[in-house]
């Protein structure tokens, strides 16, 4: 007698993955949702937290912006990943993340809202980061 095993993989929601990248991309939550706890890139998203704490302890006289810069860079990477995930076509998304789920993705307006919010906040954070960094590097922080 032969038995066949049916592997059931949970369906991964593209809008939810993008929302996680938008809200918690700093901590790599979207990576853990998609790939599980063994994802190395997800754990790399957590590395800036102890790095920022170490900078705060080792360089207490440094400007606060330098101390949180690793966190900002991780957040910007999370925003970028949220955009990449959300803009992936549904058929490619299903082939990569939902091959064994037995369901097809059908994204709608919630994903569009997440993508617009991600682009707005991500662009704003990037511009503010560049402005503050250039201010600190070229004027020593004279403008703030």
What do the predicted segments below correspond to?
Residues 2-18, 43-144:
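Transmembrane helix recognition focused on a "late"/terminal membrane span
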Residues 20-31:
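N-terminal signal-anchor/start-transfer transmembrane helix
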């Amino acid at each position: 007698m032969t038995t066949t095993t049916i592997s059931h993989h949970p369906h991964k929601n593209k809008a939810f993955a993008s929302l996680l990248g938008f809200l918690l991309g700093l901590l790599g939550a979207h990576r853990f949702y998609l790939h599980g706890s063994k994802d190395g890139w997800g754990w790399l998203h957590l590395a800036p937290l102890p790095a920022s704490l170490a900078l705060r302890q080792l360089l207490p006289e440094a400007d606060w912006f330098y101390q949180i810069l690793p966190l900002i860079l991780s957040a910007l990477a999370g925003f970028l990943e949220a955009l990449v995930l959300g803009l992936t076509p549904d058929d490619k998304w299903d082939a990569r993340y939902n091959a064994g789920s037995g369901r097809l993705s059908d994204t709608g307006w919630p994903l569009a809202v997440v993508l617009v919010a991600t682009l707005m906040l991500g662009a704003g954070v990037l511009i503010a980061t560049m402005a503050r960094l250039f201010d600190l590097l070229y004027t020593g922080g004279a403008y703030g």
